[in-house]
């Protein structure tokens, strides 16, 4: 077992930047007569009086009776028994550290850290660092304690100060600890204040370079790429506004539309992120932006991640443009032959004004006459390279409007999309009622079904979402196939549609149409219906095993209902065995419908690396010490410093700033330039 195989540590640099995830105070040695099984950790000095092996095979365990003269505790190992017996001797002095428990009336410490007093030196004194490891590493005795000892050896070898990665001015102006001192103290802090200062220095540097990278690229893009100028609001836009607009725009929609008009009329390329909760009217704003492109002689394109969503956008936009002489086409992987050829020809001649599609629109055979605006819906579901290909369909890049119904916390948006201008639609169209969310345990299913029957009798429709398609031997969860049969039996007079990710597209679309048209009263599905499906008549969303879903996913699923004028309900069904984090998630869902509040809570509970879509960014997983949920203020602070540098010295003429650009260049070798393309 090698450390590089499990933790991607290939050099001393990687090792020294592998930071502890927590620290435990080891400044005190207890006497055995002082301790009890409720203490979080204990540290004892004493000797092993004897060893005892109990059980056979997998049940085998080794117990060492350890004493300091005031009492006896049992040290217990379930693995590595031969190694332990060979390494530790009877009646020699050791310091042991671990978590106490009580078993058969005696204090036990399972798999403790054990050191000879003379071996402690840098490690295991004061605040002890703890490093993340895997179970396989622990079985090979490459545990946190082993990494700590390796780290102590490396730190002791640093005789000369390491080259600085921040300029003297930044270090001085912001009272930052020198790099070498910070690295020593992050691994082996001399006291809590030294640890705090080391963490601050390293977080500052990490977030500073993230922002410097984003802002420098944004500045460079503005310099290199001019945008098409949409000078006029013409007949197309005005006709739609006066004759086809389905309802009055909300104040938020008007504000966002004004921001977009300012962008496309400015002469610089628009690169804007449009956030809006489910049902907030983003598609209407996107359509009106596309009509501005048409008024100025350009084409527009909208790309969606799935055929279902692309079809839905196509039908919605065709309906909104009814009676207007605008050719709108749909291009997906399933459209072939003469129909496809006609669409491609229409794009080249300019007859096709608006193209809506999936990733099929980025294929090499798809070329436009004059593409002026690209709208990317649910963009986190596309890879960076896919988005880039659409962005480069013209010699001069088109304006880009990125839409998401997955609200992104402000700190995360600054990190992932810091080079984009951000617009937020933060109000729902008039007449929408807040969705009532209920947490219900599995054993109250009959009362839930009675409520569902009442909704169906009143003409409403119901979604039921399952975490699995088929039964699993590994986990005991509700699954769609069994659920489908159960629902058929429970609701004999109803038509039940079924959709999951392993169905062929044609079959999936057929089942979706059954539900969309109202022929099916109930749809059982997996999370394939999470994004974009719009059935205003659906008023109930039941999520089975809701404890298996993250906050963001629960919120997206809930957003499939509440799209009509009637009261809607979301029922979160779970068993009784829930973790504390799960209880918190469910309480948040019951308490609020606000997607941004939910996104902030999700960031705090899960961290940025786990949030849906951040994996595409190439940055969430690269943060070694900063935490976007906790370090939002620091992020804003370093962003202002980076902005000042980029604005005043964009070409790094100042000797002070050369070190910054040099360090940024070395960091960027390992990072994708995701900032370029939303």
Predicted regions and their residues:
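Short, surface-exposed secondary-structure boundary micro-motifs
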Residues: 47, 99-100, 213, 546, ...
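Accessory helical-bundle/CTD segments and flexible terminal tails appended to RecA-like ATPase motors
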Residues: 512-522, 529-536, 541-544, 559, ...
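Conserved small/polar residues in nucleotide/adenosyl-binding loops
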Residues: 1-6
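Inter-lobe coupling/hinge segments of SF2-like helicase ATPases
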Residues: 255-258, 269-587
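Upstream accessory/linker segments immediately N-terminal to the RecA-like ATPase cores of bacterial MutS
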Residues: 54-244
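Conserved pre-motif I regulatory segment
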Residues: 228-274
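OB-fold nucleic-acid-binding modules
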Residues: 18-45
């Amino acid at each position: 077992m090698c450390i590089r195989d499990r933790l991607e540590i290939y050099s001393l640099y990687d090792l020294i930047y592998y930071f502890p995830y927590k620290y435990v105070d080891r400044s005190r040695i207890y006497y055995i007569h002082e301790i009890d099984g409720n203490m979080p950790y204990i540290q004892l000095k004493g000797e092993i009086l004897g060893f005892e092996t109990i059980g056979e095979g997998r049940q085998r365990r080794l117990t060492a009776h350890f004493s300091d003269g005031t009492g006896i505790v049992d040290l217990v190992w379930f693995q590595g028994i031969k190694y332990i017996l060979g390494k530790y001797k009877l009646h020699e002095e050791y310091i042991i550290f671990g978590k106490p428990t009580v078993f058969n009336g005696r204090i036990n410490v399972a798999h403790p850290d054990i050191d000879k007093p003379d071996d402690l030196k840098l490690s295991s004194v004061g605040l002890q660092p703890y490093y993340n490891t895997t179970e396989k590493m622990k079985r090979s005795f490459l545990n946190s304690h082993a990494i700590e000892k390796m780290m102590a050896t490396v730190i002791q070898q640093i005789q000369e100060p390491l080259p600085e990665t921040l300029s003297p001015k930044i270090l001085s102006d912001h009272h930052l600890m020198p790099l070498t001192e910070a690295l020593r103290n992050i691994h082996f802090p001399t006291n809590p204040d030294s640890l705090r200062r080391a963490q601050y220095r390293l977080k500052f540097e990490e977030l500073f370079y993230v922002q410097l990278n984003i802002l420098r690229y944004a500045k460079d893009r503005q310099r290199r790429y001019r945008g098409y100028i949409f000078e006029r609001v013409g007949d197309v836009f005005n006709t739609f506004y006066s004759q086809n607009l389905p309802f009055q725009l909300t104040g938020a929609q008007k504000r966002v539309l004004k921001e977009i008009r300012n962008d496309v009329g400015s002469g610089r390329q628009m690169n804007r992120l449009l956030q809006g909760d489910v049902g907030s009217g983003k598609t209407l704003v996107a359509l009106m932006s596309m009509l501005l492109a048409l008024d100025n002689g350009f084409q527009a394109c909208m790309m969606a991640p799935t055929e279902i969503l692309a079809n839905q956008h196509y039908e919605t936009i065709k309906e909104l443009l009814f009676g207007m002489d605008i050719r709108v086409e749909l291009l997906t992987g399933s459209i072939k032959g003469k129909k496809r050829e006609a669409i491609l020809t229409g794009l080249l001649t300019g007859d096709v004004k608006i193209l809506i599609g999936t990733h099929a629109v980025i294929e090499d055979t798809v070329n436009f006459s004059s593409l002026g605006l690209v709208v990317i819906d649910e963009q986190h579901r596309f890879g960076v390279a896919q988005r880039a290909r659409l962005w480069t369909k013209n010699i001069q890049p088109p304006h880009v409007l990125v839409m998401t119904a997955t609200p992104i916390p402000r700190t995360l948006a600054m990190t992932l999309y810091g080079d984009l201008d951000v617009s937020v639609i933060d109000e729902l169209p008039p007449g929408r009622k807040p969705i009532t969310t209920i947490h219900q345990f599995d054993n109250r299913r009959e009362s839930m079904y009675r409520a569902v029957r009442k909704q169906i009798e009143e003409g409403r429709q119901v979604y039921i979402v399952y975490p699995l398609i088929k039964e699993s031997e590994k986990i005991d969860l509700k699954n769609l196939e069994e659920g489908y049969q159960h629902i058929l039996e429970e609701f004999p007079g109803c038509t039940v549609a079924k959709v999951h990710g392993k169905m062929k597209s044609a079959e999936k679309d057929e089942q979706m149409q059954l539900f969309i048209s109202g022929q099916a009263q109930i749809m059982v599905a997996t999370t394939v219906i999470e994004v974009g499906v719009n059935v205003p008549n659906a008023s109930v969303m039941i999520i089975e095993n809701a404890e298996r879903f993250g906050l963001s996913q629960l919120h997206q699923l809930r957003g499939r209902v509440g799209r009509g004028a009637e009261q809607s309900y979301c029922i979160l069904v779970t068993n009784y065995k829930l973790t504390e984090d799960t209880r918190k998630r469910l309480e948040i869902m019951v308490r609020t419908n606000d997607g941004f509040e939910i996104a902030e809570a999700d960031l705090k509970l899960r961290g940025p690396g786990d949030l849906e879509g951040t994996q595409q960014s190439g940055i969430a997983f690269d943060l070694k010490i900063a935490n976007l949920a906790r370090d939002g203020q620091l992020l804003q602070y370093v962003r202002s410093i980076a902005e000042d540098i980029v604005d005043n010295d964009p070409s790094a003429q100042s000797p002070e700033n050369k070190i910054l650009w040099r360090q940024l260049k070395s960091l960027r070798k390992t990072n994708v330039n995701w900032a370029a393309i939303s």
